[in-house]
């Protein structure tokens, strides 16, 4: 969708007029090497979003030894475009299928790993302590129990499955 917005601004306007006010945009790095799929198109896509009043969430897939050294740069790029980029949703890569341990360890990165790298790459401007876990499924089941007066199952996820902060 970002490449389409970059190449065809009219399509971006049509999407906005159809009611879409936010675009989740793949953005894996600040260099052509780490973000080959849409590095050159990103500025044009942001310009289209700026003109149409569409906000953007960058969604980088983070892969250890590939782009984990650019997390601070991604945040800085988002800050430079704060008028249109309202969030960055870092997604550690999901490795599935048959893969040897050494290869898995080469690329695997966790949310806590990302948070640590962000602190290092922002020179402590965004610290590990600035983050909080975002799992919010359990309160929903508690509300359902309160309204139904019947015990329900609890939906929960591991605390390290997500983290958020505001900067």
Residue ranges and their predicted role:
Residues 94-167:
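A C-terminal junction/extension of Radical SAM enzymes
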Residues 1-92:
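Radical SAM/AdoMet-radical enzyme domain recognition
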């Amino acid at each position: 969708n970002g490449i389409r917005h970059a190449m065809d601004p009219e399509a971006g306007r049509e999407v906005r007029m159809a009611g879409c006010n936010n675009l989740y945009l793949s953005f894996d790095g600040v260099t052509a090497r780490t973000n080959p799929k849409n590095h050159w198109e990103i500025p044009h896509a942001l310009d289209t979003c700026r003109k149409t009043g569409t906000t953007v969430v960058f969604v980088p897939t983070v892969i250890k030894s590939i782009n984990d050294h650019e997390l601070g740069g991604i945040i800085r790029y988002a800050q430079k475009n704060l008028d249109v980029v309202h969030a960055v949703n870092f997604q550690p890569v999901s490795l599935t299928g048959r893969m040897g341990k050494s290869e898995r360890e080469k690329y695997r990165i966790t949310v806590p790993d990302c948070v640590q790298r962000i602190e290092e790459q922002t020179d402590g401007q965004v610290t590990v302590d600035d983050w909080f876990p975002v799992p919010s499924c359990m309160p929903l089941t508690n509300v359902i129990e309160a309204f139904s007066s019947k015990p329900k199952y609890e939906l929960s996820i591991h605390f390290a499955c997500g983290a958020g902060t505001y900067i």
